Amino acid sequence: MLRDGNEGMSTIPGFNQIQFEGFCRFMDQGLTEELYKFPKIEDTDQEIEFQLFVETYQLVEPLIKERDAVYESLTYSSEFYISAGLIWKTSRDMQEQTIFLGNIPLMNSLGTSIVNGIYRIVINQILQSPGIYYRSELDHNGISVYTGTIISDWGGRLELEIDKKARIWARVSRKQKISILVLSSAMGSNLREILENVCYPEIFLSFLTDKEKKKIGSKENAILEFYQQFACVGGDPVFSESLCKELQKKFFQQKCELGKIGRRNMNRRLRLDISQNNTFLLPRDILAAADHLIGMKFGMGTLDDMNHLKNKRIRSVADLIQDQLGLALVRLENMIRGTIGGALRHKLIPSPQNLVTSTPLTSTYESFFGLHPLSQVLDRTNPLTQIVHGRKLSYLGPGGLTGRTASFRIRDIHPSHYGRICPIDTSEGINVGLIGSLAIHAKIGRGGSLESPFYEISQRSKGARMLYLSPGKDEYYMVAAGNPLALNQGLQEEQVVPARYRQEFLTIAWEQVHLRSIFSFQYFSIGASLIPFIEHNDANRALMSSNMQRQAVPLSRSEKCIVGTGLERQAALDSGVLAIAEHEGKVIYTDTDKILLSGNGDTLNIPLVMYQRSNKNTCMHQKPQVQRGKYIKKGQILAYGAATIGGELALGKNVLVAYMPWEGYNFEDAVLISERLVYEDIYTSFHIRKYEIQTHVTSQGPERVTREIPHLEAHLLRNLDKNGIVMLGSWVETGEILVGKLTPQMVKESSYAPEDRLLRAILGIQVSTSKETCLKLPIGGRGRVIDVRWIQKRVGSSYNPETIRVYILQKREIKVGDKVAGRHGNKGIISKILPRQDMPYLQDGRPVDMVFNPLGVPSRMNVGQIFECSLGLAGGLLDRHYRIAPFDERYEQEASRKLVFSELYQASKQTATPWVFEPEYPGKSRIFDGRTGDPFEQPVIIGKPYILKLIHQVDDKIHGRSSGHYALVTQQPLRGRAKQGGQRVGEMEVWALEGFGVAYILQEMLTYKSDHIRARQEVLGTTIIGGAIPNPEDAPESFRLLVRELRSLALELNHFFVSEKTFKIKRKEA
């Protein structure tokens, strides 16, 4: 965080800073750390030695630009070179060469990586910090059982338990445990050393029986006992070196490597002074942990809160990428060892370049970015989504939790989250509470701790010093919560203020306060901070709003919100969608494609984004805002991006809304809208779809892209150019050909049609031996072709086919079935589009644009929408914009209501419209029915809230099935739009049909129109030619499946068919 010149004031940190700092930490420290771990490699005869010279490494600037990497499906990466030496020990000769280790993907200005043409982002993970933790649980008798859990750097756990006889056990597996004396002896301590290093030797001696003495009589005996319990081996195993190696690999390496963070935590918790470089568990640690456990048993010491953030660590992008580099270097080491041995066996002279290949590093990073759960495709629905995605914190992933096993306690909000993790912004569903979002001012400190800033209040000096505190440290201070000084230093402090101390809330005198918060948004994430009047909303609805703002579609014409929070500008600046001047200068040329700047004798070319597709098919576009000949300064905005206007985030529109029921069309959150929103393109958005086809070389020859496609109607090919590819600017409809392609196939003489054989025999005409495999426009894809990319085969690549991509732009107006939402969790589906003359209208004659259901407010307790609605109306009339900080009630009671009513009153005075503020029912107004002209019985709340159009659009969801695939087992239609699936008649549908008594329809739906294989084909035929549908003569497939399942349970079930004519029983086999 930066400090301003004003004392006690600060600026908001960059929202992408977390990602940048992590990647820079990897480049500065992590890269060299892993290279220094790479060992010197010798052959088996120790004649040759291979080593890397770490100081000589270099990263080369990428050869391609980011935009080209996206279009050509390449990785935006840097080539990694380092010097390596091969030393012959007999002659002391050394051969040194610069070798190519591989490609390391780089981070771009958005804080993301481009891998195979896809924007990917690595999110941060929260893990249990390595160290020791003491807990108490009740057994089945209601007696407290104390345990100490040692967590290793790799996530392995070693549990120490104390029973009611004060005997201490180490649990080596789920079912087996050994005495603490056996464990200490196996780690190298004898009995005398054990008794000298513990605080309670008499307790250790109390459970030292003769049998126990024999087990710890020597280190070998202790290891044998340990191995017997660990591996559950019976009999009398014999001590050997292989037995020790197995224990080392399977137990000690997984459960006893603490790492630097674990060593620091262990020293602090057990008050030890072991060196930080000693990162393995020692006998001294085990004995000190046992002493503490005995103390817990007798009521001394404090238990640990496993969910406290001081006991967690953040695994950032730096840690994850560094781990992958270490993994790649281990693979490279094994490969070099094998290659050296092979070369010497065949009496070849190796060189560093022959020994090293780039495959381990390149493939490791590609698999990491492509397959790792914490590497995700960047969500680019709108600018806000891009920022928020990189600030996520996940408990899931390797070494973490799973959505099905995580307890409620882990998902819950903890007091230590204050100012570090947003208490509101989390995902809905099974992962609720497991995927959080960083608070605005939080940062990742040394050792992976989450730090939050505070102002230190000093009685000596009037100045406020800002400091970052890790989760455990702020508990020892009195922290003032929600004090006005956080916004205005000139305000006189109250005598008594609410404060936080050791996870409790107190009321104390101002003189006792040590720290105060620095900003009113300090506790929230970016998404939650963009909700005005958030303090008047239920937290569940604020959570929904935080998520839904990320689903808002950029509109064709953006509009600033009348009521905001003040963070809109910062969010737009950090999102990367704005073009910002990096140098001052003069604009010498500008168009929709680029801006040319002249300054300091150089000409700078700034390319603009034109109709670029995001991975959610939304349109990313930049509009230049500077004119030729104008002088600009560094940091000035040159072009606005998608969903931004005036340098601020603009996700929706300010529309006139009435809260009232209307003929049942807004029942259950449905929304009634005016046709003005359609005809004036208020909620029109552009979407870009990508369609691609590849040409392969088959066994019969290469596939051809051509315009000459036989047996296809001419109108389907009318948009193709001479090469067989659709022309730019063409309007294409469903079913039309985008790319013409023929695939060769082997055709036997006998498979020709008779007329084809006749043509060949008489005229010698060669009939086509190719089948058409053209790229056709699927259903719902109509639009304008805006770009075509033909990506040729890479040089020297035999496997990479040619790819042709066609980009089609769609213009979508708002329609029935689309989803809209406000910023307070108030969401709904468009149910009807009314003519504007039928909409309710105000006293000045203006028809409203939307009608919301008023019953959606009281039960959901999101009253903030009412404040925003009324203040938006006042702002629209006064031509003002408001930026409201949250929790304004701390200044005075009813501050929000007073502000809204005063602005409404001022608007009614200045615009001479007394109906805007009527004292009898302030905030409400009498409005009229557009169909009859009569006033409605009750006054209605009207206003101008900010309403978003979400990406859940009916064009993407509507689906019908005429024919398609069936499931192999049940012979019923598949599920889902992507599989061309259909609806099935389930038990609830059967109940509905039974309720209406429609026996024949029920029979059809359950038999020959459903899963009766032969009968459903006959139904199709009789429907086409007309006639009676024949009755099936055997059982449907679902009944046969039931019979088979019962047979698998050893229940024989036969079914019989009774003929209508003879009434004779005919037995049918299932």
Curated annotation (Swiss-Prot):
It catalyses: RNA(n) + a ribonucleoside 5'-triphosphate = RNA(n+1) + diphosphate. In plastids the minimal PEP RNA polymerase catalytic core is composed of four subunits: alpha, beta, beta', and beta''. When a (nuclear-encoded) sigma factor is associated with the core the holoenzyme is formed, which can initiate transcription. One of its GO terms (biological process) is DNA-templated transcription. Belongs to the RNA polymerase beta chain family. CDD domains: RNA_pol_B_RPB2. It comes from Daucus carota (Wild carrot). This is DNA-directed RNA polymerase subunit beta. Keywords: Chloroplast, DNA-directed RNA polymerase, Nucleotidyltransferase, Plastid, Transcription, Transferase. InterPro entries: DNA-dir_RNA_pol_bsu_ext_1_sf (IPR042107), DNA-dir_RNA_pol_su2 (IPR015712), DNA-dir_RNAP_su2_dom (IPR007120), DNA-dir_RNAP_su2_hyb_sf (IPR037033), RNA_pol_bsu_bac (IPR010243), RNA_pol_bsu_CS (IPR007121), RNA_pol_Rpb2_2 (IPR007642), RNA_pol_Rpb2_2_sf (IPR037034). GO terms for cellular component: chloroplast; DNA-directed RNA polymerase complex; mitochondrion. The gene is rpoB. Its main location: plastid. It holds the Pfam family RNA_pol_Rpb2_2. DNA-dependent RNA polymerase catalyzes the transcription of DNA into RNA using the four ribonucleoside triphosphates as substrates.
